Amino acid sequence: MEKLQPARLEFVAYDTPYSAAFDDVYHSALGGPAQARHVFLAGNELPARWQDKYRFVILETGFGTGLNFLATWQAWRDDPQRCRRLHFISFEKHPFTLADLATCQQAWPEFAELAAELQQKWPPLVPGMHRLHLNDGQVILTLTFGDAATQLRSIDASVDAFFLDGFSPPKNPELWSPHFCKGLARLTAPGATLATWSVAGHVRQALKDAEFDVAKRPGYIGKRQMLVGRFRSRRPDRHVAPTDRRAIVIGAGIAGSSTAHALAAAGWQVTVLEQATAPATGASSNLAGMLRPLPSADDNRLSRITRAGFLATRALLAALPEARWSPCGVLHLAREPEHEGQQRRAVEQLGFPPEVLQFVESDEASRLLGQPVTIGGWWFPNGGWVQPPSVCRAALAAFPERITTHFNAAVARIVRQNDQWQALDANGNLLAEAPVLVMASGAAAPRFEQFAWLPQRSGRGQVSHLPASVGKPLNTVLFQIGYTIPAIDDTQLIGASLSYEDDESAEREADHRDNLARLRLTLPDFASDLDPATLHGRVGFRPMSPDRMPIVGAVPDTMTATPNTRLHNIPRQPGLWCVQGFGARGIVWSALMADLLVSQLEGEPLPLERDLVDALDPGRFLIKAARNSGGELPSDEETSEPAA
């Protein structure tokens, strides 16, 4: 994995920001905002083309200082006929640090309010996609930090307008190549347009070869000409937005509540059906759970998804002031010296900013924790603990005009009648009806006929509650063999046990004893006199997928596939979706998976790279079965993470 190198901010004549890496300026010295409006907005016939539409999607090839985005956002805000949702996708190989971004944007006082909101939500400089919900969720900025030439193929979107604004072709040839232009053409919506300041002959030819009709237009001050274009193919739009935005969500745990919140934020009317008397009574009822990503030296799929999920959860928590959580940090100690070396090397290889991930030696780990430890490990300064029930309640209450909850509503079966999904109780009474149904009932999902195929196992987990007076108070969440969460409401949490083929709902003293034993391996003197027979806690059942990845997407309409079947060729049951298989990572995954599912439902740009979306698709298990590549559930340290 190539480390992300931040841009180095420099200025040349007229205080114009300049890139030493590409030996080029970020925008015209003769008026950046005016250039953005002339070339990219007017060149794409905006704002006229987005007027009276539900959504409009723009893709930009270089985010740079954010000037084009701010100019577009401002034009959208000023237009009373604007589209309801504006998506803006942009790439940046060398993003600015927050401080440098703010310095650049000080030059445009007309964008001060918008720039402040953007800066408030500016993501840490780590590779991958970053989804920012701005302007009360009506403007969605999807930033991809990395090389656009290689990242373009990971985008799944239907683009209405392209802003071709890389550095000059001689300095940045990859973003003007025939191959790149054909990649842009793959993403076009019907009637898609483009605009760029470059009129180089080979750029025009590359765009023509990619089926764009191009023409020269008068350029901005100091540049005689610019280029505009329109995609000439009439292929149908693959991403059609639904017209009837009503959905049923079964389950009010953290998966279902987050999904209902995301649907409502996108304008859907949502009915949540929960068999219990309140939200978050199953695996999401823990007093608290851990929030942190899971890095790997090779930045594998699990690492990338948990990192994206961690950032999405942080963003959701910021939008839900009633949700209870603490960014106290998470200390993930190594198991033994060899593992300590692996952790240290992973931090060096990843090169993430210190606010995301650090390696700390044992003395610094002891200082952070407030307890002596004998080994170092990973430190996540922005991690912490989250109280899942408070998140569920806050999410369900955020849109009272769009979310209707029904508790004590036990769904016995679901059927599809007249293009509507119906949720029925045991007596056949109709509980709810809608064209879309999302299954988010965790371990209970396989009892429904349409989900009997679901290859998830129920993992029984037990956490133990310790009085806050036991041991010296911890400053951070601690994880090693097991985990410990600092005192919340006079209670510390330790855990968690894990067993399969085990439906015992009562607490077991043996599991409390095991939880204490894991804690004492890390902190030998902590709670050394505590009798496990005196402890209480809670038991939950986690839905675990075979590959430990979530199961999110449209539900297959067939239970068979061939080894050569492609995911997108598997037929799907109309209107039937699932967000399942979160296992012990419900806190870190729920917000991101909800965003992904809503984006798929709406036909909007996806918040994850295509390979990660495929790794979550429910249809993957059919293909794996056909290839005889299914595997046993792995056994690793992560099995003792808290359920949420």
Swiss-Prot record:
It catalyses: 5-aminomethyl-2-thiouridine(34) in tRNA + S-adenosyl-L-methionine = 5-methylaminomethyl-2-thiouridine(34) in tRNA + S-adenosyl-L-homocysteine + H(+). GO terms for molecular function: flavin adenine dinucleotide binding; oxidoreductase activity, acting on the CH-NH group of donors; tRNA (5-methylaminomethyl-2-thiouridylate)(34)-methyltransferase activity. Residues 250-644 are annotated as: FAD-dependent cmnm(5)s(2)U34 oxidoreductase. Its main location: cytoplasm. Gene3D superfamilies: D-Amino Acid Oxidase, subunit A, domain 2, FAD/NAD(P)-binding domain, Vaccinia Virus protein VP39. One of its GO terms (biological process) is tRNA wobble uridine modification. Keywords: Cytoplasm, FAD, Flavoprotein, Methyltransferase, Multifunctional enzyme, Oxidoreductase, S-adenosyl-L-methionine, Transferase, tRNA processing. HAMAP family: MnmC. In the N-terminal section; belongs to the methyltransferase superfamily. tRNA (mnm(5)s(2)U34)-methyltransferase family. This is tRNA 5-methylaminomethyl-2-thiouridine biosynthesis bifunctional protein MnmC. It comes from Dechloromonas aromatica (strain RCB). The lineage of its organism: Bacteria, Pseudomonadati, Pseudomonadota, Betaproteobacteria, Rhodocyclales.
